[in-house]
Structures are given as structure tokens and as C-alpha cells.
Amino acid sequence: MNDYTKYTIGVLSLQGAVSEHIAQIETLGAKAIAVKSLSELQQVDALVLPGGESTAMRRLMHSSGLFQALKSFDKPILGTCAGLILLANKLEGGEPPHLAKMNIQVQRNAFGRQVDSFQTDLMIKGFADSFPAVFIRAPYISRIGSEVEVLAEWQGNVVFAKQGNLLACAFHPELTSDTRVVELFLQQLKE
């Protein structure tokens, strides 16, 4: 197992799933902190943009003064569900992009409403066994740029991608006991 004890990982905690991400990060040995301010953001080696409601998160990023700092944040980022939407540089339906850090286009709520949430075994590039992916009002990536690597698809739709030190997934890895997605994210710190 890798040693992540020297790293501090932030989880943006303006809205959305935070404690589950913190627990998984700490399980792997890294220090995890909730990020609500610029001073907290400046302490981290990498950042998780959690699930939640992307439009509400954008408003809170602006009101907290974090929006511009997040746009210029150049360390590794893992965006899950709404976090994927925040990372996209294009959203279907004409909605303006949020942080626009990844060359991807995203369809929001692509798999239906809350009642249509599901878990499936997902094959992820580089993983020997399937991953128990939990989809809750999940988006998917409808278009990718040439610099984006597809890590997983479900029913022909891209649901996990990588661009440089950015990872974006449509599902919630923090809602399972399987830590491989978070470990893949933490490995970005060693590259």
C-alpha cells in the first residue's frame, strides 16, 4: 500500500457529500480537511469536488469567495457527480459552465431522477475487478476532447474520465467500501 500520510486532501464542503469522502481519504492514510475558505484551500495538496447540487455549489463558491481560487487551482482534483459537472467546460442545454477545467461536455441528470438511482458493477480501466458504482441523479460525459482519457463507460456513456491531474466520475465512489477510485486519485500526487 502507498504511503499518503504526508498529504492533506481537501473536500469542498459548501454543500453535498463530505463526511464520506473524508472517511475514505483517511482510510488510505492521508489527512483530510473540509474546505470552506480560501485559507483552507491553500493548505491542501489535492481537492475533492463532491456530489450535491452543482448550481447551488456554484452560488456558494461565489458567495464564499472561492470561485476564482478554484478556477486557478492547479493541483489534482477528483470531481464526483456534481463535481464532474463543475469541472466540465460545456454543459448540454446551454447552461454556462462552472469551473470549466476539463475538455468535456456533460448531460446533467442523464440517468433519471432520484428514484432512478442505482448501483452497478463497473469495469474501470486499470482495475482487475469491477467497481461497485453508485449512480444518484447522475450525469454522464457526452463529448470528450482529444486530451481526455476515458476510464469507464456504462451502457455506451462515458462515466469516468481523466485529463492531466483531473479525474471526473458520474458515480459516488465514497458511498462504497471500495477505495480504489480514491486511491487512483491519490496516486496523482506521486506523478
Swiss-Prot record:
Keyword hit for Hydrolase: yes
Pathway(s) per entry: Cofactor biosynthesis; pyridoxal 5'-phosphate biosynthesis
E.C. number: 4.3.3.6, 3.5.1.2
Keyword terms of this UniProt record: Glutamine amidotransferase, Hydrolase, Lyase, Pyridoxal phosphate
Gene Ontology BP, a term: glutamine catabolic process
Active site feature: 81 (nucleophile), 172 (charge relay system), 174 (charge relay system)
Binding residues for L-glutamine: 52-54, 108, 136-137
Domain of life per record: Bacteria
HAMAP family hit by this protein: PdxT (MF_01615)
Known role: Catalyzes the hydrolysis of glutamine to glutamate and ammonia as part of the biosynthesis of pyridoxal 5'-phosphate. The resulting ammonia molecule is channeled to the active site of PdxS.
Quaternary structure and interacting proteins, as annotated: In the presence of PdxS, forms a dodecamer of heterodimers. Only shows activity in the heterodimer.
Protein name per the record: Pyridoxal 5'-phosphate synthase subunit PdxT
Organism: Actinobacillus pleuropneumoniae serotype 5b (strain L20)
Gene label: pdxT
